[in-house]
Amino acid sequence: MAKEDSIEMEGTVVDTLPNTMFRVELENGHVITAHISGKMRKHYIRILTGDKVTVQLTPYDLSKGRIVYRAR
């Protein structure tokens, strides 16, 4: 899938799940399940509850996403 096909949205981490999965509430109110991208995992970027994050969603399944950025 090409990078242009993904949808990027802002959200807040609501809950931490096992296996580096997180429950993220998007700005529009939807709650999705998201995992950390490989580069964030490689650079040991920690994500805590309450962090503002940028999430990439695919048009095929809007209930799952990938966390690509954590706001400072």
Swiss-Prot record:
Q: Which domain of life is it from?
A: Bacteria
Return the similarity comment: Belongs to the IF-1 family.
> Subcellular localization, per the record?
Cytoplasm
Keyword Zinc-finger on entry: no
Provide the protein name: Translation initiation factor IF-1
Q: Cite the Gene3D superfamilies for this sequence.
A: Nucleic acid-binding proteins
Gene Ontology molecular function terms on file: ribosome binding; rRNA binding; translation initiation factor activity
Q: Keyword set for this entry?
A: Cytoplasm, Initiation factor, Protein biosynthesis, RNA-binding, rRNA-binding
Q: Where is the S1-like domain?
A: 1-72
Function noted in UniProt: One of the essential components for the initiation of protein synthesis. Stabilizes the binding of IF-2 and IF-3 on the 30S subunit to which N-formylmethionyl-tRNA(fMet) subsequently binds. Helps modulate mRNA selection, yielding the 30S pre-initiation complex (PIC). Upon addition of the 50S ribosomal subunit IF-1, IF-2 and IF-3 are released leaving the mature 70S translation initiation complex.
User: Does the keyword RNA-binding feature in the UniProt annotation?
Assistant: yes
Q: Which HAMAP family match?
A: IF_1
Cite the record's note on assembly.
Component of the 30S ribosomal translation pre-initiation complex which assembles on the 30S ribosome in the order IF-2 and IF-3, IF-1 and N-formylmethionyl-tRNA(fMet); mRNA recruitment can occur at any time during PIC assembly.
Cellular component, GO annotation? cytosol
InterPro entries hit by this protein? NA-bd_OB-fold, RNA-binding_domain_S1_IF1, S1_domain, TIF_IF1
